[in-house]
From Swiss-Prot:
Lineage, uppermost ranks: Eukaryota, Viridiplantae, Streptophyta, Embryophyta, Tracheophyta
Organism from which the protein derives: Stellaria longipes
One GO term describing the cellular component: mitochondrial intermembrane space
Record's protein name: Cytochrome c
Function in brief: Electron carrier protein. The oxidized form of the cytochrome c heme group can accept an electron from the heme group of the cytochrome c1 subunit of cytochrome reductase. Cytochrome c then transfers this electron to the cytochrome oxidase complex, the final protein carrier in the mitochondrial electron-transport chain.
Entry annotated with the keyword Calcium: no
Keyword annotations from UniProtKB, A to Z: Electron transport, Heme, Iron, Metal-binding, Mitochondrion, Respiratory chain, Transport
Subcellular location per the Swiss-Prot or TrEMBL entry: Mitochondrion intermembrane space
Amino acid sequence: MGFKEGDAKKGANLFKTRCAQCHTLGEGEGNKIGPNLHGLFGRHTGSVEGFSYTDANKAKGIEWNKDTLFEYLENPKKYIPGTKMAFGGLKKDKDRNDLITFLQDSTK
């Protein structure tokens, strides 16, 4: 199974409760513990200016899109062994779909 459109409102709540402590969304907002997510879609792993990535993130070499995010967000450490992202992942497909649907609009 892969990405399917979700509920952006539920995704916003997931972002607020599971992601916002480490990530920002807006253009020009700084990095926190994790990188700023503005312009996420179409960007390559390990490429946000001013953020200190692990070699594993830089070497992964994939482009973030709905499908790569869907797989990554299930278990970040499995998808990119060596990442410093401490988040354990979202195991439910629906939660990942909702979050990615929210991120599509909020990271433009």
